[in-house]
UniProtKB/Swiss-Prot annotation:
Binding site for dimethylallyl diphosphate: 48, 84, 134, 233-235, 278
Name of the protein in question: 4-hydroxy-3-methylbut-2-enyl diphosphate reductase
GO terms for MF: 4 iron, 4 sulfur cluster binding; 4-hydroxy-3-methylbut-2-enyl diphosphate reductase activity; metal ion binding
HAMAP family membership: IspH
Active site: 136 (proton donor)
Species annotation: Brucella anthropi (strain ATCC 49188 / DSM 6882 / CCUG 24695 / JCM 21032 / LMG 3331 / NBRC 15819 / NCTC 12168 / Alc 37) (Ochrobactrum anthropi)
Amino acid sequence: MTDQRPSLEIRLCGPRGFCAGVDRAIQIVVLALKKYGAPVYVRHEIVHNRYVVEGLQSRGAIFVEELHEIPAEHRDQPVVFSAHGVPKSVPADAEAKNLFYLDATCPLVSKVHKQAMRHQRLGRHVILIGHSGHPEVIGTMGQLPDGAVTLIETVEDARSCHFDDENNLGFVTQTTLSVDDTAGIIEELQARFPNLSAPAAESICYATTNRQDAVRSAAPGCDLFLIVGAPNSSNSKRLVEVAEKAGARMSMLVQRAADIEWDRIGDISVVGLSAGASAPEIIVDEIIDAFKARFNVKIELAETTVETENFLVNREIRDVELTVQDMAFVNGEHRVVGIPKLMPKIIQGK
């Protein structure tokens, strides 16, 4: 019987999905649960993805907004800080409450914290390029005293900002920003403040840059570009913007296959597909399956680089072994209930 489904090319971007920092953060919660038992408390979403959060909840993690929400009878259980980083006041509060905590801050976010503190130590007022209210921005600003950091969100902000000492300024950036948009803000700041000091190393992380490069490469000629990610995921929203600017006719952010607006899509022959750094691979598979149910799909890999970065987990939990099923869950390849769909792609101790 002839296949009557229309043909569709899916350009599957690589790299996509979980980065080393997200892998590490999820591992920390899983390892803590295995070593200390449930419940393990997590301050804020460990990463911006409900699928991951719900999977960890099913294993015994309890998510809270602030430390005072942890019941007195559970104060001997560990609490994990999210991958986005926290202000200095949070670990200080944990110590005051005699809580045992594990910091899952991405090492690349911690690097930005150190860059900001170095600027201040050298007598510079710190300019932070980022999005107001994002947990990473709150964490970075919370490394320094009130008034020591000015947040710049747009080129317009860069044009209108003023400082008491324009010769002693240094900037850092949120790690998940659009590379192109950030370049425009930095260019404007450098034009206005020629003595502006840059960080010793790039603030935007390798995973953000790599995912944007892959989307930029795949987008021209796409009728539709889907980005798997949460609405509160900064790096995922930037990928939607990159796809549109790079030539995709339409770009959408979806959390699950059920979010795809089939009626809005219309006639399509080429679809781009990528995932933000906190989106699990199993949802990418789910979306491909949804297209296969409607189209005769041909998948083309649009890979621009291969990532090999690995980050160690906290010393306190390195003695715990993960099973194959644990590792598949950490990699986003494992449904909350059931057996692993794919073999793991990480090494324990990463």
